[in-house]
Amino acid sequence: MRMLLGSFAVYAAAALCEIGGCYAWWCWRRAGAGAWVLLPGMASLALFGWLLTLVDSDTAGRTFAAYGGIYIVGAIVWLRLVEGRPVTLRDAAGVAICLAGAAIILSAGRGAER
């Protein structure tokens, strides 16, 4: 259980970094922000990559697959809190399905392919 909670914390931090970094590019290209927003955006994306290496997993693919579910939750939270858009029933259903998938992958743990 401790590994799952630790992985979740790393995944949540990674999602914040990835979404924030990508949002900087979005703001520059689509919302008219100055190019200066790209510097913290790139730093955030670099931190995202480093954070994923902290997850206790034998394989990058399993780490990235489990992270995908957490990323989707983070993106929907971002939609609501940063962009001020409502979360729809379909958003919530999609999040639930993705979290179930991430939980299955995470619960397999190390050495699951044996």
UniProtKB/Swiss-Prot annotation:
Subcellular location: Cell inner membrane
Chief localisation class: membrane
Domain of life, source organism: Bacteria
Membrane topology value: Multi-pass membrane protein
Transmembrane segments: 8-28, 35-55, 64-84, 92-112
GO cellular component: plasma membrane
Entry annotated with the keyword tRNA-binding: no
Matching Pfam families: UPF0060
Keyword Cell membrane: yes
Keywords, comma-separated and alphabetical: Cell inner membrane, Cell membrane, Membrane, Transmembrane, Transmembrane helix
Family: Belongs to the UPF0060 family.
UniProt xrefs under NCBIfam families: PRK02237.1
PANTHER family: UPF0060 MEMBRANE PROTEIN YNFA
Name under which the protein is recorded: UPF0060 membrane protein GDI3492/Gdia_2889
Organism: Gluconacetobacter diazotrophicus (strain ATCC 49037 / DSM 5601 / CCUG 37298 / CIP 103539 / LMG 7603 / PAl5)
